Amino acid sequence: MAVDNFKPTLWEGALIANFHSVSIADVLATPPADIKGNKVIFNRIAGGTLKDYEGSVDWDEIDTTPVEMIFDKKKYFAFALDDVDKVQLKADVMTATTKEHAAVLAETYDKDFFAALLAGTKLLIGSSSAKKKVTPLNAYDYIVDLGTQLSKKKVPKVNRFVTVNADYLGLLSKDKRFTDNPKVLENGVVEGQVINGMQVMCSEELPANVVIANHKSAIGAAKQINEMEAMRLQSKFADGIRGLCVYGDKVLREDASAALYFEVGTAADVDPINVKITNDTKNPVNTKEVAGA
């Protein structure tokens, strides 16, 4: 029977590889230091200490605080194939199958990731009830402000990201300080675009009307594919493949992320530019007489 030749590691590897290529959360989060069963451990390092030198040296122990996370979210997939053997031998069919399921899994994983990150964010510009009006003239500036919020908390300069949705990316594209033709890679990276030290990312899995800036140390995330198996289906003449994905996320540093609540403004929200011209002896306006006028 075809299912006797099923190779679970082959499918798991293909699924995870495709997942990594499309999940934005994997780029933004800290990976776990250790995974034991359904428990994940992240190590948070305490701040360093400087002392005045007076002829002797006192040694400090490196202090790490283990932060535990349980895989509290579980999703499964199950699909039927006419012949598992044939699909495993045809790389294009297997790639398409695993890529599609990896994309669906990544969407759910990223959506939960951003919801957790926002819930743990304390540095806010605007609020859910008082959103900032954003136009092409100030969209870039608000992202600069998010980066400034992180800098004021002394968040490390490297591994900073800011994630926007397609609407916000469109507003940025109309600002001369940004590119007018942004290229979004498969994993959400907006190629070559950095604002105030933050790599610009794009995702539609963000909470509505929110832009989030974060350092990788702000949140940890992990997932596992469990129970990958094949079986002969009784209800149809086909083989079935199913798998269970368990995952979770944990906010590690509340001061390492900042969020903007916004709504897209209209032309009426753009501040008018008033130019006042005076023409007197102190501030004369140079004019030129036109012959025959």
Region annotations inferred by a language model:
Residues A2-L50, D60-A78, V134, D175-A293:
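Sequence/fold signature of self-assembling virion shell proteins
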Residues V84-K152, Y261-D280, P284, E289-G292:
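Alpha-helical scaffold segments that mediate packing/assembly in large oligomeric complexes
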Residues L118-A119, D167-L171, P207, A293:
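Short, catalytically relevant binding-site loops at active-site mouths
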Residues D52-Y53, L172:
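Residues that scaffold the ATP/ADP-binding catalytic core of kinase and kinase-like folds
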